[in-house]
Structures are given as C-alpha cells and as structure tokens.
C-alpha cells in the first residue's frame, strides 16, 4: 500500500528581514538548555559517604579544636598554678630565711647582753681584787728586797771573813820575820853560843869514867828554848836593851 502524500508548504525566508540578526540575538539571549544529568546510584552513595565523612571530619575538627582550647586553658591554668606554687615556695623560703636571720640576731643580742652583764659583774670584782693584786705585787717586791738583802748580807759576810783571815795571818808572818838576837846576860835566858854548846855536848873521857850519866836537867839546859811569839819576843828584846 502506498503512503498518503502529505501537504507540503513552501516557506520563503526572504519575507523575514532580520533573519540573521534574530538568529544571533536568539543565540545570545537564550543559552543552551540546561539538562539535568541523572547520577548513578554509585555516585550518590559515594557522595553520601563523602558527605558523612566530611561531616565526621568537621565534627572531629571541631572536637579537636575544643580539646586544643581546653588543653590550652588547662596549660594556662597549670602554668598559673605552677607560678603560684613557685611564688609560694619562694615566699616560704624567704620567710624561713628571714626567721632564721631574726633568730640569729636575737641570739647575738642575747649573747651580747649576757657578755655585757658578765663584764659589768666582773668589773667590781676586778676593782676589789686590784688592791690585793697590788699588795701581792708589793709583797713580791718585799720578797725581792729580802732576797737582795740576803745577797747583800752574804756578800758582807764573805767580805768580813777574809778580813778575819787577814787578822789571823799576821801572827805567822811575825814569827817568820822576827828572829830574836842572842842575849848576853847573867841570868837572862838566851840561845847559847855554838862553842858553849859544843863544849857542853863533848865532855872529856875522864868525866865520862868518873861521873855517871848526866841528869836529865842538863839535857834540858842544853836544848834550845822554845820559840816565842812575836809579842813575847818583843818583850824579851825590851829588857835586853835596858841591860
């Protein structure tokens, strides 16, 4: 079967004057039609997952930001607490050092006051003892004088002893120097001469036969008289001069 023929109308474009301009304006004014592209279910799932992940990431980031802020605040508080602790420790140390210095000052003052009191108490005792010390020193001086007097006495005694010896010594000197001269007198006692003594000592042989031994008186007469002291010799010499 043949198809029916359609009625065709011939259109003259020349009738329209602004055909080219209209096309240009139309192309400028109306852009291409926007068509929505249908996304596949996989892409939708991926988008959903990415959205969830982005939300989770944002939440995590927010949590992290909050935590960091909290940490910063805690660290700031900790630093402040540490600073306060350090300040307290320093204050305690300073207070302890001040207390120790005050105690030392108090002890030094107490010791100084005690020493002053002891010095004040010792001052009158020293004043009292000063006189006794002077007396003791005077006694020492007396002792020294006594010792010096003893030495002087010893020296005087030593000097006096040789004087006594000198007094005793002249007697033997006089004995040695004084030689009594033979006295010529009748009844005076004197040293016999050598001739007389020889005659008396050498008797004749006849007399020896006739006479017995000579009595002891003759022997005594023949012996020289004992030596007299210088004074006695001087006394004997005086009467000899008178004769």
From Swiss-Prot:
Instruction: Give start-end positions of Acidic residues composition bias.
Output: 111-124, 132-145, 232-243
Taxonomic superkingdom: Eukaryota
Q: Enumerate composition-biased segments (Basic and acidic residues).
A: 64-77, 197-206
**Free-text description of this protein's post-translational modifications in UniProt:** Phosphorylated in an ATM-dependent manner in response to DNA damage. Phosphorylated by CDK1 and casein kinase.
**Residue ranges with Low complexity bias:** 91-100
Q: Which GO terms describe its molecular function?
A: chromatin binding; DNA-binding transcription factor binding; double-stranded DNA binding; RNA binding; single-stranded DNA binding; transcription coactivator activity
Q: In which tissues is it expressed?
A: Widely expressed, with highest levels in thyroid gland, prostate and uterus and in fetal liver, thymus and lung.
An example Gene Ontology CC term for this record: chromatin
Where Phosphotyrosine occurs, the residues are: 13, 26
Instruction: Give UniProt keywords alphabetically.
Output: Chromosome, DNA damage, DNA repair, Nucleus, Phosphoprotein
**Basic residues composition-biased segments:** 35-51, 149-174
**The protein, known as:** Nuclear ubiquitous casein and cyclin-dependent kinase substrate 1
Organism, by scientific name, is: Homo sapiens (Human)
């Amino acid at each position: 079967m043949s198809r029916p023929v359609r009625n065709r109308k011939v259109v003259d474009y020349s009738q329209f004057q602004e055909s080219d301009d209209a096309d240009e304006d139309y192309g400028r004014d109306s852009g291409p039609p926007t068509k929505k592209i249908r996304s596949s279910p996989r892409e939708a799932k991926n988008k959903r997952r990415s959205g969830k992940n982005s939300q989770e990431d944002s939440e995590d980031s927010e949590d992290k930001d909050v935590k960091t802020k909290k940490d910063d605040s805690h660290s700031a508080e900790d630093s402040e607490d540490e600073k306060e602790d350090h300040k307290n420790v320093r204050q305690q140390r300073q207070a302890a050092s001040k207390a120790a210095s005050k105690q030392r000052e108090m002890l030094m003052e107490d010791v100084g006051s005690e020493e002053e009191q002891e010095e004040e108490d010792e001052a009158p005792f020293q004043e009292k003892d000063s006189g006794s010390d002077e007396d003791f020193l005077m006694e020492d001086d007396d002792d020294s004088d006594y010792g010096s007097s003893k030495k002087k006495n010893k020296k005087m005694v030593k000097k006096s002893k040789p004087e006594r010896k000198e007094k005793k010594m002249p007697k033997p000197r006089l004995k040695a120097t004084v030689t009594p001269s033979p006295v010529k007198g009748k009844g005076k006692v004197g040293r016999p001469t050598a001739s007389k003594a020889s005659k008396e000592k050498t008797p004749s042989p006849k007399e020896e036969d006739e006479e017995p031994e000579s009595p002891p008186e003759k022997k005594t007469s023949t012996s020289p008289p004992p030596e007299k002291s210088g004074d006695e010799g001087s006394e004997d010499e005086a009467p000899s001069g008178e004769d």
